[in-house]
């Protein structure tokens, strides 16, 4: 219902996916997203504490230590050598959520759950926005009641 309201409001203002919708979408995706900031924080804290001085030490760390560092249900894997080395962090479903490389730093990977929320919200918004724009272009008012869209004509019988 909130998405339909925002789409209708944006359609009236001739804005597609305005700030309010984007903020709502971000908040909804955050509900299913892994806490990447905490994962990055744990890694950075470990690197700066002197426990792990460089990627070579990470390479030598066993999988158990990497899992302890990032916490259950996350798993980590070190891959490669030299400048092409990377650490990959996986969620409980085996989906990669973060990658760290020395030259680039952190790179976030979207999970299937996050993609699903994005898709559902964008699809619902698109349909509601399209219906509202169509009604506006046809010179009708759109009234939202529950999840149904009721179209009322602006035709004036007295004119």
Language-model regions, residue ranges each:
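Type III/flagellar secretion export determinants
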Residues: 1-159
